[in-house]
Amino acid sequence: MAFVQEPLPYDFNALEQYGMKGETFEYHYGKHHKAYVDNLNKLTDGTELADKSLEEVIQIAFKDASKAGIFNNAAQVWNHTFFWNSLKPAGGGAPTGEFAAKINQDFGSFDKLKEEFSNAAATQFGSGWAWLIDDGGTLKVTKTPNAENPLAHGQKALLTLDVWEHAYYIDFRNARPAFIKNYLDNLVNWDFAAANYAKA
């Protein structure tokens, strides 16, 4: 059973007016994400991992140093699909309802969450990801290097931001802080995060 690249939840140009060009998706989704899927299929073809779910492959390979290449590609396939869903046209704003109340409880305020998330994304050295997670019933912000993700650590991801340079270089060049601000102001999909929280 081959691993597949999930379709984008919007078209390539849907986020143009919100700070993310169609060209970004042509490269990021059309080339980078696709390459991870293709590499994962090559690395797992004919192995016992070929029939596992993507999540199972991530968890198995993370614990086995000999499967580092499989882990990196599997995690990046999962991370990118999760990232596309963490974005939406006319995103931003603020969460509502039970999820908003939980944010206030665990962070003190929504502004404090945004501050912690922005800091995590800005201070991740080199390539990686910033995450909002549910860690045993407590909401936390974390960051991971390269392909690593909360799933590998037994945590529930609610939302992510890709801070690899290829995620923002077409739109923001080397200005990662501007990319982070635009994500929180115009792109972040709090409905997706709330739905993940409800399932946690």
Swiss-Prot record:
GO terms for molecular function: metal ion binding; superoxide dismutase activity. Binds 1 Fe cation per subunit. The gene is sodB. This is Superoxide dismutase [Fe]. Belongs to the iron/manganese superoxide dismutase family. The keyword Iron-sulfur does not apply. Its EC number is 1.15.1.1. The keyword Oxidoreductase applies. InterPro entries: Mn/Fe_SOD (IPR001189), Mn/Fe_SOD_BS (IPR019833), Mn/Fe_SOD_C (IPR019832), Mn/Fe_SOD_N (IPR019831), Mn/Fe_SOD_N_sf (IPR036324), SOD_C_sf (IPR036314). Its cofactor is Fe cation. Homodimer. Destroys superoxide anion radicals which are normally produced within the cells and which are toxic to biological systems. It catalyses: 2 superoxide + 2 H(+) = H2O2 + O2. PROSITE patterns: SOD_MN. Fe cation binds at residues 28, 80, 162, 166. Gene3D superfamilies: Fe,Mn superoxide dismutase (SOD) domain, Iron/manganese superoxide dismutase, C-terminal domain. Keywords: Iron, Metal-binding, Oxidoreductase.
